Design a protein with these regions (language model features):
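Amphipathic, interaction-prone secondary-structure segments
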Residues: 38-94
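Acidic, aromatic-enriched beta-alpha/helix-loop junctions
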Residues: 88-109
Length: 164
């Protein structure tokens, strides 16, 4: 976890809850990328933009009925357009193929509740709670791709040590 994102969670979680309560589910609940962008927009990028949700790189690692999604999310940088590995955060989530085995699909489709699709509907109180829990999981799964200290270590290797 990234400490500044955890701090942002405690600062903005009520805003996220209000967002879920006042926006229809198709605005954030149809896929994990939209959910991640909502977490970035409402939690992390408030009060200032830290991550650039418009440049997220998404990868589905398996393309089968279940597996892992990973995302590379660049930090905002006013000095250059191309991020380096130090400027990126990665996030991951496991997914399933149906509302019984996939968290987001289960919330959206109302699995175990009313079994009504989320399209055009404001979420129920229990769905808001579940979206909040999933948002927290996404935030907890965000990690720096490489820290500045790790990057510096790469440059501190002495040529002579490897060429003996």
């Amino acid at each position: 976890m990234i400490k500044e994102y955890v701090d942002a969670w405690f600062r903005n979680r009520d805003k996220l809850k209000k967002y879920f309560e006042t926006h229809t589910q198709e605005q954030y609940g149809q896929n994990y990328t939209d959910m991640l962008k909502t977490v970035i927009k409402v939690i992390i990028n408030d009060p200032e933009e830290i991550l650039d949700e418009t440049k997220i790189i998404e990868r589905n690692l398996t393309n089968y009925y279940q597996g892992d999604y990973i995302w590379l999310i660049p930090r905002k940088n006013e000095y250059y357009d191309e991020p380096t590995v130090v400027d990126c955060v990665f996030c991951y989530v496991k997914y399933g193929s149906c509302c019984g085995c996939d968290t987001l699909m289960g919330i959206y489709e109302g699995f175990g509740e009313d079994n009504q699709w989320g399209e055009g509907l404001l979420p129920s109180e229990s769905r808001v709670r579940d979206y909040m829990y999933l948002s927290l999981q996404l935030l907890q799964n965000m990690k720096p791709l490489m820290t500045l200290e790790e990057a510096r270590q790469n440059y501190e290797i002495k040529y002579e040590d490897y060429m003996k």
